Protein backbone atom coordinates (compact mmCIF):
# COMPACT_ATOMS: atom_id res chain seq x y z
CA UNK A 1 0.00 0.00 0.00
CA UNK A 2 1.21 3.50 -0.89
CA UNK A 3 1.57 5.50 2.34
CA UNK A 4 2.26 9.18 2.80
CA UNK A 5 2.40 11.55 5.76
CA UNK A 6 0.77 14.88 6.58
CA UNK A 7 3.23 17.79 6.34
CA UNK A 8 0.88 20.77 6.67
CA UNK A 9 -2.72 21.47 7.73
CA UNK A 10 -4.32 24.82 6.85
CA UNK A 11 -8.00 24.66 7.79
CA UNK A 12 -9.63 22.33 5.32
CA UNK A 13 -6.53 22.03 3.12
CA UNK A 14 -4.10 19.23 3.97
CA UNK A 15 -0.68 18.76 2.33
CA UNK A 16 0.59 15.17 2.17
CA UNK A 17 4.11 14.00 1.29
CA UNK A 18 4.68 10.70 -0.56
CA UNK A 19 7.79 8.73 -1.51
CA UNK A 20 9.74 9.43 -4.70
CA UNK A 21 7.65 8.46 -7.77
CA UNK A 22 4.66 7.45 -5.62
CA UNK A 23 2.47 10.56 -6.07
CA UNK A 24 -1.27 9.74 -6.33
CA UNK A 25 -2.95 11.26 -9.44
CA UNK A 26 -5.30 14.25 -9.16
CA UNK A 27 -8.81 13.48 -7.77
CA UNK A 28 -7.53 10.36 -5.97
CA UNK A 29 -9.12 9.66 -2.58
CA UNK A 30 -6.78 9.32 0.41
CA UNK A 31 -7.72 7.87 3.80
CA UNK A 32 -6.54 9.19 7.15
CA UNK A 33 -7.69 8.34 10.69
CA UNK A 34 -8.76 11.56 12.41
CA UNK A 35 -9.26 11.14 16.19
CA UNK A 36 -11.03 14.53 16.22
CA UNK A 37 -14.01 13.03 14.35
CA UNK A 38 -14.46 9.65 16.07
CA UNK A 39 -12.38 6.60 17.00
CA UNK A 40 -12.99 4.72 13.74
CA UNK A 41 -10.13 3.94 11.37
CA UNK A 42 -9.85 5.77 7.99
CA UNK A 43 -12.76 8.04 8.94
CA UNK A 44 -11.57 11.06 6.94
CA UNK A 45 -11.36 11.15 3.15
CA UNK A 46 -9.06 13.65 1.42
CA UNK A 47 -9.19 14.34 -2.32
CA UNK A 48 -6.01 15.25 -4.21
CA UNK A 49 -6.42 18.70 -5.78
CA UNK A 50 -2.88 19.85 -6.70
CA UNK A 51 0.68 18.54 -7.09
CA UNK A 52 2.94 21.08 -5.42
CA UNK A 53 6.39 19.62 -6.22
CA UNK A 54 8.88 17.98 -3.80
CA UNK A 55 6.60 14.90 -3.72
CA UNK A 56 3.86 16.86 -1.91
CA UNK A 57 0.18 16.86 -2.91
CA UNK A 58 -2.40 19.39 -1.72
CA UNK A 59 -5.73 17.82 -0.76
CA UNK A 60 -9.19 19.00 0.27
CA UNK A 61 -10.89 17.34 3.27
CA UNK A 62 -14.36 15.84 2.82
CA UNK A 63 -15.02 16.25 6.55
CA UNK A 64 -13.67 18.29 9.46
CA UNK A 65 -9.87 18.32 9.70
CA UNK A 66 -9.75 19.33 13.40
CA UNK A 67 -7.55 16.77 15.13
CA UNK A 68 -5.07 16.17 12.29
CA UNK A 69 -1.39 16.72 13.12
CA UNK A 70 1.81 16.65 11.07
CA UNK A 71 3.36 13.24 10.59
CA UNK A 72 0.09 11.29 10.59
CA UNK A 73 0.09 8.40 8.08
CA UNK A 74 -2.16 8.74 5.00
CA UNK A 75 -3.26 5.82 2.78
CA UNK A 76 -3.52 6.17 -1.00
CA UNK A 77 -6.66 4.28 -2.11
CA UNK A 78 -5.58 4.33 -5.77
CA UNK A 79 -9.10 5.37 -6.85
CA UNK A 80 -11.29 8.48 -6.81
CA UNK A 81 -14.02 8.62 -4.14
CA UNK A 82 -16.03 5.42 -4.70
CA UNK A 83 -19.80 5.57 -4.23
CA UNK A 84 -21.96 2.56 -3.29
CA UNK A 85 -24.60 2.09 -6.02
CA UNK A 86 -27.55 -0.15 -6.83
CA UNK A 87 -30.75 -1.17 -5.06
CA UNK A 88 -29.05 -1.19 -1.63
CA UNK A 89 -28.83 2.63 -1.74
CA UNK A 90 -32.61 3.07 -2.07
CA UNK A 91 -34.32 4.18 1.12
CA UNK A 92 -30.98 5.19 2.67
CA UNK A 93 -29.34 8.52 3.49
CA UNK A 94 -25.67 8.65 2.54
CA UNK A 95 -23.02 11.35 2.51
CA UNK A 96 -20.52 12.53 -0.09
CA UNK A 97 -18.16 9.56 0.41
CA UNK A 98 -20.93 6.94 0.44
CA UNK A 99 -21.12 6.41 4.20
CA UNK A 100 -24.58 6.23 5.75
CA UNK A 101 -25.83 8.98 8.05
CA UNK A 102 -29.25 7.50 8.91
CA UNK A 103 -27.99 5.33 11.78
CA UNK A 104 -29.10 2.08 10.11
CA UNK A 105 -25.66 0.57 9.48
CA UNK A 106 -23.53 0.60 6.30
CA UNK A 107 -24.93 0.15 2.78
CA UNK A 108 -25.00 -3.57 2.02
CA UNK A 109 -23.49 -3.72 -1.49
CA UNK A 110 -20.35 -4.82 -3.32
CA UNK A 111 -20.93 -2.49 -6.27
CA UNK A 112 -19.06 0.82 -6.24
CA UNK A 113 -18.49 3.49 -8.90
CA UNK A 114 -16.08 6.47 -9.00
CA UNK A 115 -17.74 9.90 -8.65
CA UNK A 116 -15.56 11.43 -11.39
CA UNK A 117 -16.60 10.11 -14.80
CA UNK A 118 -16.79 11.46 -18.33
CA UNK A 119 -20.13 12.41 -19.87
CA UNK A 120 -21.67 9.87 -22.31
CA UNK A 121 -20.23 10.07 -25.84
CA UNK A 122 -22.33 11.62 -28.63
CA UNK A 123 -22.91 8.18 -30.12
CA UNK A 124 -24.44 6.92 -26.86
CA UNK A 125 -26.81 9.85 -26.40
CA UNK A 126 -30.49 9.60 -27.27
CA UNK A 127 -31.55 12.63 -29.29
CA UNK A 128 -35.26 11.85 -29.62
CA UNK A 129 -37.46 14.20 -27.59
CA UNK A 130 -40.00 12.48 -25.37
CA UNK A 131 -42.24 14.01 -22.72
CA UNK A 132 -42.07 12.79 -19.13
CA UNK A 133 -45.59 12.67 -17.69
CA UNK A 134 -45.58 13.94 -14.10
CA UNK A 135 -49.31 13.72 -13.34
CA UNK A 136 -49.25 17.37 -12.17
CA UNK A 137 -51.69 19.27 -14.41
CA UNK A 138 -50.01 22.67 -14.51
CA UNK A 139 -46.60 21.14 -15.30
CA UNK A 140 -47.83 18.64 -17.90
CA UNK A 141 -49.91 21.30 -19.70
CA UNK A 142 -47.72 24.41 -19.63
CA UNK A 143 -44.20 23.32 -18.63
CA UNK A 144 -43.79 19.79 -20.05
CA UNK A 145 -40.65 18.02 -18.83
CA UNK A 146 -38.41 16.51 -21.54
CA UNK A 147 -37.30 12.96 -20.70
CA UNK A 148 -33.60 13.29 -19.95
CA UNK A 149 -33.88 17.06 -19.72
CA UNK A 150 -32.97 19.57 -17.04
CA UNK A 151 -35.57 21.82 -15.42
CA UNK A 152 -34.86 24.65 -13.00
CA UNK A 153 -37.26 25.34 -10.14
CA UNK A 154 -37.20 28.92 -8.92
CA UNK A 155 -39.00 30.05 -5.80
CA UNK A 156 -38.58 31.74 -2.46
CA UNK A 157 -39.03 30.16 0.94
CA UNK A 158 -42.34 28.51 1.74
CA UNK A 159 -43.99 28.51 -1.70
CA UNK A 160 -43.87 24.73 -2.02
CA UNK A 161 -40.71 23.71 -3.93
CA UNK A 162 -40.20 20.68 -1.70
CA UNK A 163 -43.84 19.55 -1.90
CA UNK A 164 -43.85 19.73 -5.72
CA UNK A 165 -40.57 17.80 -5.71
CA UNK A 166 -41.92 15.12 -3.38
CA UNK A 167 -45.11 14.74 -5.43
CA UNK A 168 -42.99 14.15 -8.53
CA UNK A 169 -40.91 11.54 -6.70
CA UNK A 170 -44.19 9.89 -5.59
CA UNK A 171 -45.78 9.95 -9.05
CA UNK A 172 -42.70 8.68 -10.86
CA UNK A 173 -42.36 5.87 -8.31
CA UNK A 174 -46.04 4.87 -8.31
CA UNK A 175 -46.99 5.36 -11.96
CA UNK A 176 -43.76 4.57 -13.82
CA UNK A 177 -41.99 2.39 -11.25
CA UNK A 178 -39.18 4.92 -11.59
CA UNK A 179 -36.35 5.66 -9.22
CA UNK A 180 -35.47 9.04 -7.75
CA UNK A 181 -32.19 10.31 -6.35
CA UNK A 182 -32.17 13.42 -4.17
CA UNK A 183 -29.00 15.50 -3.77
CA UNK A 184 -29.11 17.89 -0.84
CA UNK A 185 -26.30 20.32 -1.65
CA UNK A 186 -25.62 22.89 1.08
CA UNK A 187 -29.09 22.18 2.46
CA UNK A 188 -30.32 23.15 5.91
CA UNK A 189 -29.93 20.03 8.05
CA UNK A 190 -33.48 20.57 9.36
CA UNK A 191 -34.90 20.56 5.81
CA UNK A 192 -33.00 17.39 4.96
CA UNK A 193 -34.32 15.73 8.11
CA UNK A 194 -37.91 16.89 7.36
CA UNK A 195 -37.69 15.58 3.79
CA UNK A 196 -36.49 12.17 4.99
CA UNK A 197 -39.35 11.81 7.48
CA UNK A 198 -41.99 13.15 5.07
CA UNK A 199 -40.85 10.70 2.40
CA UNK A 200 -40.88 7.90 4.95
CA UNK A 201 -44.43 8.78 6.06
CA UNK A 202 -45.76 9.10 2.50
CA UNK A 203 -44.32 5.73 1.42
CA UNK A 204 -41.97 7.14 -1.25
CA UNK A 205 -38.67 6.37 0.50
CA UNK A 206 -38.14 2.77 -0.77
CA UNK A 207 -37.92 4.12 -4.37
CA UNK A 208 -35.52 6.97 -3.58
CA UNK A 209 -31.90 7.42 -2.57
CA UNK A 210 -30.90 10.50 -0.56
CA UNK A 211 -27.37 11.93 -0.74
CA UNK A 212 -26.77 14.81 1.66
CA UNK A 213 -24.00 17.36 2.08
CA UNK A 214 -25.48 19.95 4.42
CA UNK A 215 -24.55 23.54 5.19
CA UNK A 216 -22.46 22.39 8.16
CA UNK A 217 -20.19 20.28 5.95
CA UNK A 218 -16.86 21.69 4.78
CA UNK A 219 -16.75 23.09 1.22
CA UNK A 220 -15.00 19.99 -0.16
CA UNK A 221 -18.04 17.85 0.67
CA UNK A 222 -20.54 20.39 -0.68
CA UNK A 223 -18.57 20.73 -3.92
CA UNK A 224 -18.64 16.95 -4.49
CA UNK A 225 -22.00 15.75 -3.13
CA UNK A 226 -23.86 16.57 -6.37
CA UNK A 227 -21.37 14.35 -8.26
CA UNK A 228 -21.86 11.57 -5.69
CA UNK A 229 -25.65 11.66 -6.15
CA UNK A 230 -25.28 11.80 -9.93
CA UNK A 231 -23.09 8.66 -9.81
CA UNK A 232 -25.88 6.78 -7.99
CA UNK A 233 -28.34 7.93 -10.69
CA UNK A 234 -25.93 7.01 -13.52
CA UNK A 235 -25.72 3.42 -12.29
CA UNK A 236 -29.51 3.02 -12.50
CA UNK A 237 -29.47 4.58 -15.99
CA UNK A 238 -26.47 2.77 -17.50
CA UNK A 239 -26.52 -0.63 -15.80
CA UNK A 240 -30.21 -1.15 -15.03
CA UNK A 241 -31.60 0.83 -18.01
CA UNK A 242 -33.96 2.86 -15.81
CA UNK A 243 -35.48 6.31 -16.24
CA UNK A 244 -34.22 8.16 -13.19
CA UNK A 245 -35.28 11.45 -11.66
CA UNK A 246 -32.44 13.46 -10.09
CA UNK A 247 -33.36 16.30 -7.75
CA UNK A 248 -30.70 18.82 -6.79
CA UNK A 249 -31.44 21.30 -4.03
CA UNK A 250 -29.69 23.68 -4.41
CA UNK A 251 -27.51 23.92 -7.52
CA UNK A 252 -26.29 27.39 -6.46
CA UNK A 253 -24.66 25.87 -3.36
CA UNK A 254 -22.61 23.59 -5.63
CA UNK A 255 -21.15 26.66 -7.33
CA UNK A 256 -20.72 28.45 -4.00
CA UNK A 257 -18.76 25.51 -2.54
CA UNK A 258 -16.62 25.42 -5.70
CA UNK A 259 -15.76 29.08 -5.14
CA UNK A 260 -14.73 28.35 -1.53
CA UNK A 261 -12.52 25.42 -2.57
CA UNK A 262 -10.97 27.53 -5.33
CA UNK A 263 -10.06 30.25 -2.82
CA UNK A 264 -8.61 27.67 -0.41
CA UNK A 265 -6.37 26.39 -3.21
CA UNK A 266 -5.16 29.93 -3.89
CA UNK A 267 -6.60 30.34 -7.37
CA UNK A 268 -7.20 33.86 -8.68
CA UNK A 269 -10.95 34.61 -8.41
CA UNK A 270 -12.94 35.80 -11.43
CA UNK A 271 -16.07 38.00 -11.57
CA UNK A 272 -17.92 38.54 -8.23
CA UNK A 273 -15.34 36.33 -6.48
CA UNK A 274 -16.39 33.09 -8.20
CA UNK A 275 -13.87 30.45 -9.22
CA UNK A 276 -12.18 30.93 -12.63
CA UNK A 277 -13.37 27.42 -13.57
CA UNK A 278 -17.08 28.14 -12.90
CA UNK A 279 -18.25 27.21 -16.41
CA UNK A 280 -16.14 24.04 -16.51
CA UNK A 281 -17.22 22.82 -13.06
CA UNK A 282 -20.91 23.25 -13.83
CA UNK A 283 -20.52 21.87 -17.36
CA UNK A 284 -18.86 18.67 -16.10
CA UNK A 285 -21.82 18.04 -13.80
CA UNK A 286 -24.60 19.05 -16.21
CA UNK A 287 -23.26 17.20 -19.26
CA UNK A 288 -23.48 13.89 -17.38
CA UNK A 289 -27.22 14.46 -16.83
CA UNK A 290 -28.64 13.21 -20.13
CA UNK A 291 -30.59 10.49 -21.95
CA UNK A 292 -28.64 7.60 -23.42
CA UNK A 293 -29.76 4.68 -25.55
CA UNK A 294 -30.00 2.65 -22.30
CA UNK A 295 -32.02 4.96 -20.06
CA UNK A 296 -32.38 8.56 -18.96
CA UNK A 297 -31.70 10.95 -16.11
CA UNK A 298 -34.23 13.77 -15.87
CA UNK A 299 -33.12 16.45 -13.49
CA UNK A 300 -35.05 19.02 -11.46
CA UNK A 301 -32.77 21.61 -9.93
CA UNK A 302 -33.72 24.25 -7.41
CA UNK A 303 -31.91 27.47 -8.24
CA UNK A 304 -31.30 30.15 -5.63
CA UNK A 305 -30.80 33.55 -7.25
CA UNK A 306 -28.50 35.73 -5.10
CA UNK A 307 -30.12 39.12 -4.38
CA UNK A 308 -32.68 38.34 -7.14
CA UNK A 309 -29.99 39.22 -9.70
CA UNK A 310 -30.41 36.89 -12.67
CA UNK A 311 -27.22 38.26 -14.25
CA UNK A 312 -25.08 36.96 -11.35
CA UNK A 313 -22.50 34.54 -12.87
CA UNK A 314 -23.82 31.50 -10.92
CA UNK A 315 -27.50 31.54 -12.05
CA UNK A 316 -26.53 32.95 -15.46
CA UNK A 317 -24.22 29.97 -16.09
CA UNK A 318 -26.92 27.56 -14.83
CA UNK A 319 -29.54 29.00 -17.22
CA UNK A 320 -27.43 27.98 -20.21
CA UNK A 321 -27.89 24.30 -19.26
CA UNK A 322 -31.63 24.28 -18.48
CA UNK A 323 -34.39 23.09 -20.83
CA UNK A 324 -37.06 24.98 -18.93
CA UNK A 325 -37.99 26.83 -15.77
CA UNK A 326 -40.77 26.22 -13.27
CA UNK A 327 -41.39 29.46 -11.39
CA UNK A 328 -43.25 29.19 -8.09
CA UNK A 329 -44.99 32.44 -7.21
CA UNK A 330 -45.89 33.82 -3.80
CA UNK A 331 -48.85 35.74 -5.29
CA UNK A 332 -50.40 32.46 -6.46
CA UNK A 333 -49.68 30.76 -3.13
CA UNK A 334 -51.47 33.66 -1.40
CA UNK A 335 -54.61 32.84 -3.40
CA UNK A 336 -54.48 29.37 -1.84
CA UNK A 337 -53.76 27.78 -5.22
CA UNK A 338 -51.25 24.94 -4.92
CA UNK A 339 -49.00 23.95 -6.63
CA UNK A 340 -48.20 27.68 -6.85
CA UNK A 341 -46.64 27.47 -10.34
CA UNK A 342 -46.79 30.75 -12.26
CA UNK A 343 -48.36 29.76 -15.60
CA UNK A 344 -47.12 32.91 -17.39
CA UNK A 345 -43.54 32.98 -16.09
CA UNK A 346 -42.72 29.28 -16.45
CA UNK A 347 -41.22 28.10 -19.74
CA UNK A 348 -40.27 24.82 -21.42
CA UNK A 349 -38.15 24.19 -24.50
CA UNK A 350 -40.49 21.43 -25.67
CA UNK A 351 -43.71 23.48 -25.61
CA UNK A 352 -43.80 22.92 -29.35
CA UNK A 353 -46.51 21.47 -31.65
CA UNK A 354 -43.94 19.12 -33.25
CA UNK A 355 -43.25 17.49 -29.88
CA UNK A 356 -46.57 17.73 -28.05
CA UNK A 357 -48.98 17.66 -30.98
CA UNK A 358 -51.22 20.50 -32.22
CA UNK A 359 -54.01 19.87 -29.69
CA UNK A 360 -51.83 20.12 -26.58
CA UNK A 361 -49.80 23.06 -27.88
CA UNK A 362 -52.76 25.23 -28.90
CA UNK A 363 -54.65 24.45 -25.69
CA UNK A 364 -51.60 25.51 -23.63
CA UNK A 365 -51.23 28.74 -25.63
CA UNK A 366 -54.96 29.49 -25.35
CA UNK A 367 -54.80 29.00 -21.56
CA UNK A 368 -51.84 31.40 -21.36
CA UNK A 369 -53.62 33.99 -23.53
CA UNK A 370 -56.75 33.92 -21.35
CA UNK A 371 -54.67 34.23 -18.16
CA UNK A 372 -52.61 37.08 -19.65
CA UNK A 373 -55.80 38.94 -20.66
CA UNK A 374 -57.14 38.50 -17.12
CA UNK A 375 -53.87 39.85 -15.72
CA UNK A 376 -54.13 42.90 -18.01
CA UNK A 377 -57.74 43.53 -16.90
CA UNK A 378 -56.98 43.31 -13.18
CA UNK A 379 -56.14 47.03 -12.81
CA UNK A 380 -59.48 47.99 -14.38
CA UNK A 381 -61.34 45.50 -12.16
CA UNK A 382 -59.56 46.87 -9.05
CA UNK A 383 -60.50 50.48 -9.87
CA UNK A 384 -63.90 50.23 -11.59
CA UNK A 385 -65.17 46.76 -10.67
CA UNK A 386 -66.42 43.92 -12.87
CA UNK A 387 -69.55 45.79 -14.01
CA UNK A 388 -67.56 48.19 -16.22
CA UNK A 389 -66.16 45.36 -18.37
CA UNK A 390 -67.59 44.42 -21.76
CA UNK A 391 -69.49 41.12 -22.00
CA UNK A 392 -66.57 39.57 -23.84
CA UNK A 393 -64.12 40.62 -21.12
CA UNK A 394 -66.47 39.35 -18.40
CA UNK A 395 -66.48 35.96 -20.12
CA UNK A 396 -62.66 35.99 -20.36
CA UNK A 397 -62.38 36.80 -16.64
CA UNK A 398 -64.84 34.03 -15.70
CA UNK A 399 -62.91 31.46 -17.77
CA UNK A 400 -59.55 32.69 -16.46
CA UNK A 401 -60.70 32.28 -12.86
CA UNK A 402 -61.89 28.74 -13.65
CA UNK A 403 -58.57 27.93 -15.34
CA UNK A 404 -56.66 29.38 -12.38
CA UNK A 405 -58.58 27.15 -9.97
CA UNK A 406 -58.36 24.12 -12.25
CA UNK A 407 -54.56 24.51 -12.23
CA UNK A 408 -54.66 23.62 -8.51
CA UNK A 409 -54.50 19.97 -7.59
CA UNK A 410 -54.59 17.84 -4.43
CA UNK A 411 -51.24 16.07 -3.89
CA UNK A 412 -50.69 12.55 -2.57
CA UNK A 413 -47.81 13.68 -0.38
CA UNK A 414 -49.96 16.41 1.22
CA UNK A 415 -52.89 14.09 2.07
CA UNK A 416 -51.91 14.03 5.74
CA UNK A 417 -52.24 17.85 5.96
CA UNK A 418 -55.21 18.51 3.67
CA UNK A 419 -57.32 15.41 4.27
CA UNK A 420 -58.03 15.37 0.52
CA UNK A 421 -57.01 12.32 -1.52
CA UNK A 422 -54.21 13.07 -4.02
CA UNK A 423 -54.92 12.93 -7.76
CA UNK A 424 -52.71 11.81 -10.66
CA UNK A 425 -54.02 13.26 -13.94
CA UNK A 426 -52.94 11.84 -17.29
CA UNK A 427 -51.75 14.35 -19.93
CA UNK A 428 -54.63 13.65 -22.33
CA UNK A 429 -57.20 14.23 -19.54
CA UNK A 430 -55.45 17.47 -18.56
CA UNK A 431 -55.46 18.78 -22.14
CA UNK A 432 -59.11 17.77 -22.68
CA UNK A 433 -60.22 19.49 -19.45
CA UNK A 434 -58.54 22.81 -20.25
CA UNK A 435 -59.65 22.69 -23.89
CA UNK A 436 -63.28 22.33 -22.79
CA UNK A 437 -62.96 25.32 -20.42
CA UNK A 438 -61.41 27.46 -23.19
CA UNK A 439 -64.19 26.45 -25.60
CA UNK A 440 -66.82 27.55 -23.09
CA UNK A 441 -68.35 24.12 -22.49
CA UNK A 442 -68.32 24.70 -18.73
CA UNK A 443 -69.30 28.38 -18.57
CA UNK A 444 -72.35 27.48 -16.46
CA UNK A 445 -70.38 25.66 -13.75
CA UNK A 446 -69.43 27.67 -10.62
CA UNK A 447 -65.70 28.37 -10.35
CA UNK A 448 -65.48 26.80 -6.87
CA UNK A 449 -66.15 23.38 -8.43
CA UNK A 450 -62.80 23.64 -10.29
CA UNK A 451 -60.77 24.22 -7.12
CA UNK A 452 -58.56 21.33 -5.94
CA UNK A 453 -60.00 18.84 -8.41
CA UNK A 454 -58.30 16.15 -10.49
CA UNK A 455 -59.77 15.67 -13.98
CA UNK A 456 -62.74 17.51 -15.51
CA UNK A 457 -65.08 14.60 -14.62
CA UNK A 458 -64.48 15.33 -10.95
CA UNK A 459 -65.37 19.00 -11.54
CA UNK A 460 -68.70 17.99 -13.10
CA UNK A 461 -69.36 15.64 -10.17
CA UNK A 462 -68.59 18.44 -7.68
CA UNK A 463 -70.87 20.83 -9.57
CA UNK A 464 -73.73 18.28 -9.37
CA UNK A 465 -73.28 17.97 -5.62
CA UNK A 466 -73.19 21.76 -5.23
CA UNK A 467 -76.40 22.26 -7.21
CA UNK A 468 -78.09 19.43 -5.26
CA UNK A 469 -77.13 21.11 -2.00
UniProtKB/Swiss-Prot annotation:
CDD domains: ATP-synt_F1_beta_C, ATP-synt_F1_beta_N, F1-ATPase_beta_CD. Pfam families: ATP-synt_ab, ATP-synt_ab_N, ATP-synt_VA_C. ATP binds at residues 155-162. Gene3D superfamilies: 2.40.10.170, Bovine Mitochondrial F1-atpase, Atp Synthase Beta Chain, Chain D, domain 3 (1.10.1140.10), P-loop containing nucleotide triphosphate hydrolases (3.40.50.300). It is found in: Cell inner membrane. It catalyses: ATP + H2O + 4 H(+)(in) = ADP + phosphate + 5 H(+)(out). Its EC number is 7.1.2.2. Belongs to the ATPase alpha/beta chains family. It comes from Syntrophobacter fumaroxidans (strain DSM 10017 / MPOB). Signal peptide: none annotated. InterPro entries: AAA+_ATPase (IPR003593), ATP-synt_VA_C (IPR055190), ATP_synth_F1_bsu (IPR005722), ATPase_a/bsu_AS (IPR020003), ATPase_alpha/beta_chains (IPR050053), ATPase_F1/V1/A1_a/bsu_N (IPR004100), ATPase_F1/V1/A1_a/bsu_N_sf (IPR036121), ATPase_F1/V1/A1_a/bsu_nucl-bd (IPR000194). F-type ATPases have 2 components, CF(1) - the catalytic core - and CF(0) - the membrane proton channel. CF(1) has five subunits: alpha(3), beta(3), gamma(1), delta(1), epsilon(1). CF(0) has three main subunits: a(1), b(2) and c(9-12). The alpha and beta chains form an alternating ring which encloses part of the gamma chain. CF(1) is attached to CF(0) by a central stalk formed by the gamma and epsilon chains, while a peripheral stalk is formed by the delta and b chains. It comes from the Bacteria. The gene is atpD. It is a peripheral membrane protein. Keywords: ATP synthesis, ATP-binding, Cell inner membrane, Cell membrane, CF(1), Hydrogen ion transport, Ion transport, Membrane, Nucleotide-binding, Translocase, Transport. GO terms for molecular function: ATP binding; ATP hydrolysis activity; proton-transporting ATP synthase activity, rotational mechanism. Produces ATP from ADP in the presence of a proton gradient across the membrane. The catalytic sites are hosted primarily by the beta subunits. This is ATP synthase subunit beta. GO terms for cellular component: plasma membrane; proton-transporting ATP synthase complex. The keyword Cell membrane applies. HAMAP family: ATP_synth_beta_bact (MF_01347).
Amino acid sequence: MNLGKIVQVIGNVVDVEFGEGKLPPLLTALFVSNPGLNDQEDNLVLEVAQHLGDNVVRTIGMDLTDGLVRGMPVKDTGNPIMMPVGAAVLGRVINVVGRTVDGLGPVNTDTYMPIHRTAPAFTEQDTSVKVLETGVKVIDLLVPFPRGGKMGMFGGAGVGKTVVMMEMIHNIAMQHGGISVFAGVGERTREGNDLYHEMKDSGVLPRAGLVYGQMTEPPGARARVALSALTVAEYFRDVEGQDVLLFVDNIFRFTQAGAEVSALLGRMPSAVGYQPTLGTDLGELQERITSTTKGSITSVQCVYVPADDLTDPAPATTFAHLDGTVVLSRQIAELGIYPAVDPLDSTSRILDPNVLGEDHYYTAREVQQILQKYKDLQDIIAILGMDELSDEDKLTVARARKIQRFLSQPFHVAETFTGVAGKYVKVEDTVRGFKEICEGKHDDIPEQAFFMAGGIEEVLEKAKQMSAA
